[in-house]
Regions:
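Amphipathic alpha-helical segments used for helix-helix packing
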Residues: 95-115, 166, 170
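Hydrophobic alpha-helical connector segments
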Residues: 58, 72-98, 150, 154-157
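Basic, helix-initiating cap at the start of DNA-binding domains
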Residues: 1-24, 28-40, 54
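Amphipathic C-terminal alpha-helical segment
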Residues: 93-97, 128, 133, 137, ...
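Short coil/turn segments at alpha/beta junctions that flank glycine-rich nucleotide-binding fingerprints
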Residues: 23-27, 77, 98, 141
Length: 196
C-alpha cells in the first residue's frame, strides 16, 4: 500500500509539472508552483527530483501512464499490427495536445548528450513491456513476422516512433503530429507484418 502511495505522489508531481510546463512554459514554471499544483510537499518533491530539470526525464514515464490507461482497452484477440497503430495514434495525439513541443525537443537533446539515465531507452518501462507483449502475441497469431526476434521488432517500432517525434521537433511543430503519424506510421511499420 505504501509503495502505491509513493508512486501516486510522484505521479501527481509529474502531472502537475507537465500541466504547468504546457500552460506557462518550462522557464516560467517554478518548483514552488509545481508543489502547489500537485498538492504535495517540498520534501516529497525533492525526494523524487533533484530539481526542475530532473522532471524532463519524467516525460517518458508520463507516456507510460498513457499506455497503462490504454492497455485494458485492447482485446486479447485484436490484430497486433492494428493495436500497434492504435497505440501510436493515441500516444502521439496525447503528446500533440498536452506536451509543449519545446520541452519534447529539450528531452530529446538531453537524451543525446547525457551520461546518466536515459529513460527513453529504459527497457523496464511499461512502454517496452507492452510492446513486447503485443509483438509476441502478433507472432503467435501469425500476423507479425516471426523471422526476427521480439526485441528486434520492439526496437524497430520504437525507432520509427522516435523518428516521427524527432522530425516534428526539427520542424518546430509546423504540421499536425497525429495527422502525419496517421499517414506515415503504417508505411513505416508495414515491414513488421507477416508477408503473404
Amino acid at each position: 500500500m505504501a509503495k502505491k502511495n509513493l508512486k501516486k505522489t510522484k505521479s501527481k508531481i509529474v502531472s502537475a509539472a507537465w500541466k504547468l510546463f504546457y500552460e506557462q512554459g518550462y522557464e516560467d514554471t517554478t518548483v514552488e508552483e509545481i508543489i502547489e499544483e500537485s498538492g504535495t510537499s517540498k520534501g516529497s518533491f525533492y525526494h523524487y527530483f533533484e530539481g526542475k530539470d530532473a522532471l524532463l526525464g519524467s516525460l517518458a514515464y508520463m507516456m507510460d501512464e498513457k499506455y497503462e490507461e490504454l492497455e485494458p482497452t485492447i482485446a486479447d484477440d485484436a490484430d497486433s499490427y492494428e493495436v500497434l497503430l492504435y497505440l501510436n495514434r493515441e500516444l502521439l495525439t496525447m503528446i500533440e495536445e498536452t506536451i509543449n513541443m519545446e520541452l519534447l525537443t529539450r528531452l530529446y537533446s538531453t537524451q543525446l548528450t547525457t551520461h546518466g539515465d536515459r529513460p527513453l531507452l529504459d527497457h523496464g518501462r511499461t512502454y517496452y513491456k507492452l510492446l513486447r507483449k503485443i509483438i509476441t502475441r502478433g507472432q503467435e497469431q501469425g500476423t507479425l513476422r516471426a523471422d526476427m526476434r521480439v526485441n528486434e521488432l520492439v526496437r524497430y517500432y520504437a525507432m520509427c516512433e522516435r523518428a516521427l517525434l524527432y522530425e516534428w521537433c526539427l520542424r518546430k511543430g509546423e504540421y499536425s503530429l497525429s495527422e502525419e503519424a496517421e499517414c506515415k506510421f503504417p508505411m513505416m511499420i508495414a515491414s513488421m507484418k507477416t508477408k503473404n
